[in-house]
Amino acid sequence: MELVMKDAQGALTVSETTFGRDFNEALVHQVVVAYAAGARQGTRAQKTRAEVSGSGKKPWRQKGTGRARSGSIKSPIWRSGGVTFAAKPQDHSQKVNKKMYRGALKSILSELVRQDRLIVVEKFSVEAPKTKLLVQKLKEMALEDVLIITNEVDENLFLAARNLYKVDVRDVAGIDPVSLIAFDKVVMTADAVKQVEEMLA
């Protein structure tokens, strides 16, 4: 199959297994959920009644004071007491096989082509690390919410995009399923397309 290049005459011949396969929604969902789960810190921690600071002595005798009976100042119903079901640090990551991960990326890229959300260009760069220059370039291409993928990160382009909320610049090694889905359009250079094909082959 062929992908038409926006800034040059002609088209780029690409593999149908990477850019023309059916959309596997279940697989994409599983991989996206696993990717998001892997990004969770999982470091929250609370103290149980056994871990909270304080004496183990009974605050007052069982009977005769007129007050409600109490056995510990560390009880969860007391102020500064422990937490009943205290949260502990945990690993939220989910296992995803390489074949599944690659399959999900191929599925997403194919769907981007079908929806005309993937734009292939010969080259994408700016002359200086100025946000103004990048905004102007994107305006000419009628792009606003966009992920730009190059075969290697251009420092000028990276610095120019850093201050734009709806624009991100990545190299091929930095692409992930969540980013590919999150942006309205994805711009890829011809070299990046070839590199993606090699990576997912």
From Swiss-Prot:
Keyword field contains Ribosomal protein: yes
Keywords, in A-Z order: Ribonucleoprotein, Ribosomal protein, RNA-binding, rRNA-binding
Pfam name, any one: Ribosomal_L4
Region named Disordered: 44-71
GO MF term (any one): rRNA binding
Domain of life, per lineage: Bacteria
Any single Gene Ontology cellular-component annotation: ribonucleoprotein complex
NCBIfam families on file: rplD_bact
Family: Belongs to the universal ribosomal protein uL4 family.
Assembly: Part of the 50S ribosomal subunit.
Protein name (database record): Large ribosomal subunit protein uL4
Chain's gene name: rplD
